[in-house]
């Protein structure tokens, strides 16, 4: 609310006037209405007026959390790409992509503060063998799987194979916590034996439990964040395509950093506010809420146009 704002003004004279239809002397206890710019002028000791100064408070007028998007003119050639995944890493956005008519995975990047200028698509050194959908950032490295082998990079250009990693088919989620890093930080994957495996340093891996029925393995996205009630514990949530072809809901599973098992979040009976099954669905965590969006889908018997809406949840 900027209709009643108390301000502090420093000048060589106590005679500061508020310019309006009828000028008035400003005092430090005045609350001023800054819904419109306010003008001041100073009366010097010589009793002469100086220049008129204008003060304005910039107010964010967009409705908060409305997720209004604006189109950025850029040299990103999206029409040449048939599949892609974006990853945030080291203040940059990396897009791992497969060009139309090709199988090779390439990467392009832009600064998080830019979005207009993108680097040219650079094929990964093992691009024809890589799975773009497994690209993930964890700690100070990027990761991707190629022919069941795990690779890492510090810059998206130079990659090295992690020889000690088991044969993997997908990366699931990770925690990179600032609150309790020694206990919470972990990278979770699924190996070729359909078992969960995890690492706390990228080199030493531990096999956990088998992947349960119904766990999503297609169009997988994840978020991790500290609990509001206990910041030393992190929650991981995974969202993906429902493996049941006739089901119209997306699948959500979760795990706490203090656990080593996953639990699902099935839609409650007669609850119509479920997350619909969308093609290539993705999930983000923003401002203590979850947001999901994706391609074409269906909900409550109606067809959903691709990328026509965000679906939000607090739990």
List each language-model region with its residue ranges:
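Beta-rich interaction/scaffold domains
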Residues: 1-83, 115-127, 158-160
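Beta-propeller fold detector
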Residues: 65-74, 116-126, 160-168, 206-214, ...
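Beta-strand-rich domains and repeat architectures in extracellular enzymes and scaffolds
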Residues: 72-104
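Repeated scaffold domains used in trafficking and secretory/extracellular systems
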Residues: 76-88, 123-140, 164-185, 210-232, ...
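Conserved core beta-strand positions within WD40 beta-propeller blades
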Residues: 92-94, 141-143, 185-186, 235-237, ...
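Structured core of small recognition/catalytic domains
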Residues: 96, 100-167
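Structural motif
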Residues: 99-111, 146-158, 183-204, 233-257, ...
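Loop/turn-rich, solvent-exposed surfaces of beta-rich toroidal or solenoidal domains
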Residues: 274-311
